[in-house]
A protein has these predicted regions:
Chain A
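Acidic, low-complexity mobile loops and tails
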Residues: 1-55, 93-128
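Periplasm/extracytoplasmic soluble domains of Gram-negative envelope assemblies
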Residues: 21, 62-64, 72
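A short beta-loop-beta micro-motif enriched in histidine and acidic residues
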Residues: 36-38, 62-65
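Short, conserved catalytic or interaction motifs in soluble domains
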Residues: 61, 81
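Basic, polyanion-binding surface patches
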Residues: 86
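Histidine- and aromatic-rich ligand-binding microenvironments
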Residues: 67-71, 104
């Protein structure tokens, strides 16, 4: 159920490396379900330099706030402006239309430190 | 199941601005009795004042009907854990409204307000006595402001002793959100300490984190789990030996009035919530008052002003090394009057009886509900009991749903999802002011709901059904904020 | 008619009730329930006086109240942040209803629509008063609202200095200092001249308008100064002045706060009051305090609920916009009822009564030999008079005549007194004051 062409973090983010080498980042279906209806998302500004696992923003539901962490080192190229007016995209389509950040100049060697789809699914099973 | 008949009327859906009719007036003012004076230039004046225009009867009916949509202590059992929703004696409101109390200007010459200052001085003494501390400041206007003052006092204490590196405040994971928020406002880093399986602070975890950076610890006693810390003396000791100070969140004092004094247990400073323990009305979210009580070594740092007796008269003064003023004047005097009257009506024995009956009532509820609901900790509780709806969650119904269903039974819900460390928490605090008949009716309702969960879960998960409005779309409220009337809407 | 010495009318439990409950719990005495408290600390003695019956309690409080009579009767010309203004009877009638008075914070909206809709109305009227976009449900008082406004400006701009115009109320400055000290935020004073060039890293320019001395500031100029420095304009204003003076929002102020006490709240020796807090909608997520929003319920009915709670302490804990929890909801309700009762015409009229009476008083006092008005500009309902003798002496004499004189500000202006005139002062009151001052000036 989790696409194979991506890597996953233990903080429930997914990373998709695009054809031009840039990385698309979002949160997983598990994460959006845990959060409940997303009402607001705070994303980093374009040009921000981030180190792997650094906090890069926040996702809010009615009763909770969750930090967003970047799964890779890189520079923020753009963020998904559609989420400003339509945060519900994160709930409805977390792996596609609900994408959050596009990173450039990423450290692709870090992909190995992340989980594959099946590893992530096992990780979820352990969480119970 | 509806307990207030007026709730059968549909709520008025219009706002004041929508009721407004040009030319209507709510009150008449006397005509100008001095010669008209030259006005400022027109660029300094406003041309339009968009307030409603209503006649007086319309105003009265609008707000009276609005009030009828509320549950309140005067109308319903209100067992909100850690809120101490006890009866608010009417005589307290009456005496607080006396012109000699309600109409004094705060900056009037002190010689003309000795009655007010005397009341404040006595109240300071009573609260110092109850808390086992050396001195009290009444300047803080709520518990959270008391907490902020307390952490600022701790900060000042360490700075004066050349210990600026002490920037860490320890806070249990069960603490009320104001504790870490106040610590952060006080410039501290917060470190969370876990609780153990008995609902006590994990002493081993505590010992591992104390070091030279420790400023202090913020503890609620009894804890937000309604449990008395078994190792309280040792906790205070560990913190003191590491050079830190102990702050007490007094929100749960209703369990301890006349039973123990936090100052004697080892606390250095604490706040008290007059709008909880001392019966002053909650008002839908305030006014409150959060007096700060301190041991001798911290008393000089108390927020000011405080009232002193110089032998001839009462005076407002700032403590020698005060952290400063936290309000424009001297605190919420109108609330102080009510608390003073409450203490005078009860006396020491009466205060002790408050905590006895509060703890008795909570344990009675626990005894009667522990078969149908899970108890997070199987031990005697104090003035509140934390149940977990984890059993019901397995049947598809959550704590939230049970809370909403209680509204249909004519009870205000208990506190939900707090403390955070208990799954599907329902924190129930009956207070001493409820009769056994009310407690039994509540027990019956909770047992009935437990049955419904088994037999007709939908009626619980879609509750409430009989209140003026049903469950609200809170997601929409957050996604599309509509926070005020706008013209042309 | 001997009663048990511990009989309290506030507690229903009889000995029989207690017995039954102890049996159900399975312990033999109430003290068994306190077993977790170490023995050495159990049941300490309290030095509280013995309990009073209700009748005795009334007598006791009436006696204390009577000692304050000189502060309460007679005309009042004292302002400086707390004001004797007209309170319509409707305000207390509504505020004393048990459903408003004894309810809790509206966390269960289905049974709190009264409180929630009243908050929504309060937010609406606060915005309309100051011509601002968004308001919260109120804070403790005008001083802490201003302090929170300054801290909010620091969060929004990510800067750490707070400039304040030196005509700010001294007690407001003290509260601002208390709140900013621990967060490494540095307030610094500016004059009307030096405000033109604010220091770099200034988060906001704080202006009281009308200022502490009662005079209007040049908000247009000060707004420009703030913009030039990339800082926010934070204005602490007065809600009665808002009845006739152009509101701070119309000058582009980013945050406008005020003390709500003049809106139908008794002076009550300094509290409880309510802090009004408004800001531009772009800063909504940094707004402290509670906010009520309008939504619908599952049947599509309009309904009100606390919203955007993720800003607050119970969710965001140490990262909250403020630690505030219990605020001043009932006082906010009183202000709302006051504004609904006075309304569009009534508030304007109150403001004009204050203005004309204050200016009449100023004009006759400055004609008295020895008295002058040392400050220039436009004042609203307060002004400073320079006296021929120390204000302390003048006020002592006035008090003997049953008149509450203005605030002694001789530490700021030589022999200066800050006089306040409201709609509650009759022409006779003002003439009597002038006569007394004339006598004292001989």
């Amino acid at each position: 159920m989790y696409p194979d062409n991506r890597r996953y973090s233990r903080e429930h983010e997914w990373v998709l490396i695009e054809s031009d080498g840039r990385a698309l980042v979002g949160i997983t279906d598990y994460a959006q379900e845990q959060l409940g209806d997303v009402v607001f998302v705070e994303l980093p500004e374009a040009g921000t330099q981030l180190d792997q696992s650094q906090k890069m923003g926040e996702v809010e539901s009615v009763k909770a706030v969750s930090d967003l962490f970047t799964p890779l080192t890189g520079e923020v190229a753009e963020v998904n402006q559609a989420l400003v007016d339509h945060p519900e995209l994160i709930n409805d389509d977390p792996h596609d239309k609900g994408w959050m950040v596009r990173l450039a100049s990423v450290d692709a060697t870090q992909l190995d430190s992340l989980l594959s789809a099946s590893e992530y699914e096992s990780f979820l099973a352990e969480l119970g | 199941m509806k307990s207030v008949d007026s709730m059968t009327d549909a709520p008025d859906q219009k706002l004041l601005m929508e009721h407004s009719v040009p030319g209507r007036r709510g009150v008449r003012l006397p005509p100008l009795d001095v010669p008209e004076q030259p006005l400022p230039e027109s660029s300094l004046l406003r041309d339009n004042l968009p307030l409603p225009e209503l006649s007086q009867p319309e105003v009265v009916r609008y707000f009276t009907r609005l009030s009828q949509l509320n549950y309140s202590v005067d109308t319903h059992f209100y067992p909100l854990g850690s809120c101490t929703m006890k009866y608010n004696p009417k005589v307290n409101d009456q005496v607080a409204s006396l012109p000699g109390m309600a109409s004094i200007h705060p900056l009037a010459p002190e010689e003309s307000s000795q009655g007010a200052l005397k009341l404040m001085h006595r109240l300071q003494d009573y609260l110092s006595d109850i808390s086992g501390m050396a001195a009290t400041s009444l300047a803080t206007m709520a518990g959270a402001q008391g907490e902020l003052s307390g952490v600022l006092m701790i900060r000042a204490y360490h700075l004066e002793r050349g210990q600026p590196q002490r920037r860490t405040m320890l806070i249990p994971d069960s603490a009320h959100g104001t504790n870490p928020a106040s610590a952060a406002m006080g410039g501290f880093q917060v470190t969370s300490i876990p609780s153990d399986s008995h609902g006590n602070m994990d002493l081993t975890a505590l010992k591992e984190v104390v070091n030279d950076d420790l400023a202090g610890i913020m503890l609620t006693v009894p804890s937000t789990l309604g449990l008395f810390e078994n190792d309280i003396v040792e906790i205070c000791d560990v913190v003191h030996r590491a050079g830190g100070l102990v702050y007490g969140d007094g929100a749960n004092m209703n369990a301890l009035l006349g039973q123990a004094k936090l100052g004697e247990l080892g606390f250095d400073v604490m706040h008290i919530n007059l709008h909880k323990t001392f019966s002053t009305p909650h008002g839908g979210g305030g006014p409150g008052s959060g007096p700060v009580c301190a041991g001798e070594w911290l008393a000089p740092y108390l927020p000011g002003p405080i009232v002193e007796d110089n032998g001839q008269e009462y005076q407002l003064t700032m403590p020698a090394k005060s952290i400063g003023k936290v309000s424009a004047f001297h605190g919420n005097f109108g609330v102080l009057v009510r608390a003073y009257a409450y203490i005078r009506a009860l006396g020491g024995e009466g205060l002790r009886q408050v905590s006895e009956d509060a703890v008795l009532n909570a344990n009675y509820l626990m005894a009667k509900l522990k078969d149908a609901y899970d108890l997070s900790y199987d031990r005697l509780c104090m003035h509140e009991v934390v149940l977990s709806a984890s059993r019901q969650k397995k049947q598809g119904v959550r704590g939230l749903d049970i809370a909403k269903r209680l509204l249909d039974y004519g009870f205000h819900a208990p506190t939900m999802y707090f403390p955070l460390i208990v799954d599907e928490a329902l924190m129930i605090e009956p207070t001493e002011a409820e009769s056994k008949e009310t407690l039994d009716a509540f027990i019956e309702a909770m047992l009935s709901i437990a049955n419904e969960v088994a037999e007709d879960p939908d009626i619980v998960s879609h509750a409430p059904h009989t209140t003026p409005v049903s469950r609200l779309d809170e997601v929409r409220a957050a996604r599309q904020p509509d926070l005020r009337w706008q013209p042309g809407r | 008619m001997a009663e048990s010495p511990t009989f309290s009318p506030y507690t229903p439990n009889t000995p029989a009730d207690r017995e039954e409950m102890l049996r159900a719990i399975g312990v033999s005495s109430i003290q068994d329930l306190f077993g977790d408290i170490p023995q050495t600390f159990r049941t300490p003695s309290l030095s509280i006086p013995p309990p009073l019956s209700e009748m005795e309690l009334q007598r006791e409080l009436e006696a204390l109240a009577a000692e304050n009579h000189r502060a309460v009767q007679g005309p009042c010309f004292l302002g400086a942040g707390a004001y004797r203004q007209f309170i319509p009877a409707v305000v207390q009638a509504i505020a004393s209803r048990g459903e408003f008075l004894t309810s809790y914070t509206p966390y269960q909206p289905e049974v709190s629509q009264g409180t929630l809709k009243a908050i929504y109305e309060f937010q609406t009227m606060t915005c309309q008063l100051f011509d601002m976009e968004v308001a919260n449900a109120g804070m403790y008082d005008g001083a802490t609202s201003l302090a929170e406004g300054a801290l909010m400006a620091c969060r929004v701009t990510r800067r750490y200095k707070v400039a304040y115009l030196d005509t700010l109320s001294p007690s407001y400055l003290q509260v601002l200092t208390t709140y900013t000290a621990a967060q490494d935020v540095q307030p610094y004073p500016v004059s009307a001249d030096s405000a033109a060039t604010l220091e770099p890293d200034t988060a906001c320019l704080v202006v009281q308008h009308p200022n502490f001395f009662g005079y209007l500031e040049d908000l247009a100029d000060l707004e420009q100064a703030a913009r030039r420095a990339g800082a926010l304009l934070v204005v602490s204003t007065d809600p009665i002045a808002a009845g006739m003076i152009r509101p701070p929002g119309s000058y582009g102020a980013d945050i406008v706060t005020a003390e709500g006490q003049p809106l139908g709240i008794p002076m009550s020796f300094g509290g409880p009051y309510v802090g009004l807090f408004t800001c531009k909608s772009e800063y909504l997520r940094q707004l402290p305090g509670r906010i009520a929003g309008r939504t619908v319920d599952s049947q599509g009915q309009p309904a009100y609920v606390l919203t955007l709670q993720t800003r607050e302490q119970h969710i965001r804990r140490e990262r909250a916009t403020s630690n505030i929890c219990t605020a001043e909801a009932l006082i906010g309700l009183m202000a709302t009822v006051y504004l609904a009762t006075l309304g569009k015409e009534g508030l304007r009229e109150v403001a004009e009564l204050c203005y004309h009476k204050a200016h009449y008083a100023a004009s006759i006092i400055q004609d008295i030999p020895g008295y002058s008005l040392p400050l220039n500009g436009t004042f609203f309902r307060e002004f400073v008079v320079q006296c021929p003798r120390p204000p302390a002496e003048i006020n002592a004499t006035l008090l003997k005549q049953g008149i509450l004189g203005g605030l002694d500000v001789s530490d700021m202006i030589p022999n200066g007194v800050l006089l306040c005139v409201t709609e509650m002062n009759t022409r006779d009151d003002i003439d009597a004051l002038a006569a007394a001052l004339r006598e004292l000036g001989r």
